[in-house]
């Protein structure tokens, strides 16, 4: 049994409990649950409990699943724009978390510009993908993948990328998470 889904559910309960607690004893109980989650979550991701607790504390209000957006940008030869991630060396679509006040579509455009240097415009939604806690990191997440066209800029990798290239999907030796399937879906949707 994986412990991450349990810890994430307890984290959500504690965060929401603290948000809506209406007496000091209830607040104290939820603080204790949050401290235990931080301790055990820290062991699963090799971080001190204090750092985990600080990260959790940055989430305010009702906690929901994280929302991400990615861009599938193809050239005329059906090669896809990929970045080699600096954190694990795998290849994946440009993308990231949706910022407050931003739509997922806007996030896909922004993240592509930030990570690759290219300006893109949307051509359509490919699909919506979900990951449960522990499948790819600690948090549950929903990711929207958009087909996009490059309309300007030039390849200029950010600090998050070791490389940015148009690649034939068949030549990619190590994919990030389930990005191979996402690229196949985007190619089929062209």
Give the positions of each predicted feature.
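Short, hydrophobic secondary-structure boundary micro-motifs
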Residues: 19, 49-52, 156-159
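Nudix hydrolase/Nudix homology domain
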Residues: 1-32, 36, 90, 159-190
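Unchanged
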Residues: 98-122, 129-186
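Acidic, metal-coordinating catalytic segment for phosphate/diphosphate chemistry
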Residues: 24-27, 31-70
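Conserved Nudix-box catalytic region and its N-terminal flanking loop in Nudix hydrolases
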Residues: 75-114
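N-terminal strand-loop-strand
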Residues: 52-91, 120, 124
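Residue-level signal for pocket-adjacent positions within structured domains
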Residues: 62, 86-88, 93, 150, ...
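Alpha-helix C-capping/helix-to-loop hinge sites
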Residues: 16-20, 40, 58-59, 129-132
């Amino acid at each position: 049994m994986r412990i991450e889904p349990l810890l994430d559910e307890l984290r959500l309960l504690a965060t929401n409990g603290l948000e809506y607690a209406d007496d000091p004893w209830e607040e104290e109980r939820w603080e204790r649950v949050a401290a235990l989650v931080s301790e055990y979550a820290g062991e699963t991701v090799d971080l001190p409990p204090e750092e985990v607790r600080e990260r959790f504390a940055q989430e305010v209000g009702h906690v929901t699943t994280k929302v991400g957006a990615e861009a599938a940008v193809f050239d005329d030869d059906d090669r896809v724009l990929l970045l080699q991630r600096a954190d694990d060396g795998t290849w994946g679509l440009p993308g990231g978390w949706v910022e407050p006040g931003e739509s997922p579509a806007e996030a896909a455009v922004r993240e592509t510009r930030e990570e690759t240097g290219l300006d893109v415009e949307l051509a359509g939604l490919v699909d919506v993908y979900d990951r449960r806690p522990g499948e790819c990191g600690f948090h549950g997440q929903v990711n929207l993948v958009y087909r996009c066209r490059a309309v300007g800029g030039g390849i200029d990798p950010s600090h998050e990328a070791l490389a940015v290239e148009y690649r034939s999907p068949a030549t990619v030796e190590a994919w990030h998470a389930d990005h191979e399937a996402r690229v196949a879906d985007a190619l089929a949707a062209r």
